[in-house]
Amino acid sequence: MISFNGASKTYPDGTVAVHPLDLQVRTGEVCVLVGASGCGKTTTMRMVNRLQEPTTGTVSVDGRDVMSVPLRELRLGIGYVIQQIGLFPHLSVRKNVATVCGLLKWDKAKTNDRVDEMLDLVGLPPAEFGDRYPHQLSGGQRQRVGVARALAADPPVLLMDEPFGAVDPIARLHLQNEFLSLQQRVKK
């Protein structure tokens, strides 16, 4: 569960990015933040993984205040998919998906099995896509790789910041529907 208890963010110049927020997102629940550009959606999500620290209040993941969790531990337990996808252009699809597994020091066999499983899960057969590079993929395929990477280490929390905003409207609808189907299977 993710809990915001009076969590707010005010920048040093006095700009209020997030007014005090009380919100609970239960395990396995999909929560979508909707609002105008600049209203604090991204800042709210960034407070969960401490890319932004709350000015007041607390943000908790599974009952632990994120400010008390060692940063590396916190971030390794959260999958994160962003609008710009954030794939490493010099790494193959396979190596992009394996990034977090490597940070967790998984052995090669476990990592390879997990990468294959995740690529299959997002509809990118490993034999066909594993050795490709991001520039060889469509926008929707790159987004799927980003989702596979975010899920590879089986994090208890998955944050997605406008994950389908960079693709065309038809692909976006298809990816959103696929994500909801995927979420039902993995319960993230």
Question: What feature does the model see in each segment?
Answer:
Residues N49:
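Helix-to-loop junction immediately C-terminal to a conserved catalytic motif
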Residues G57-D65, L74:
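Conserved ABC transporter NBD signature motif
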Residues G102, A109-E128, S181:
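Conserved ABC ATPase "signature" region
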Residues R132-L137, Q141:
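Conserved ABC ATPase signature
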Residues L158-D161:
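Catalytic Walker B motif of ABC-type/P-loop ATPase nucleotide-binding domains
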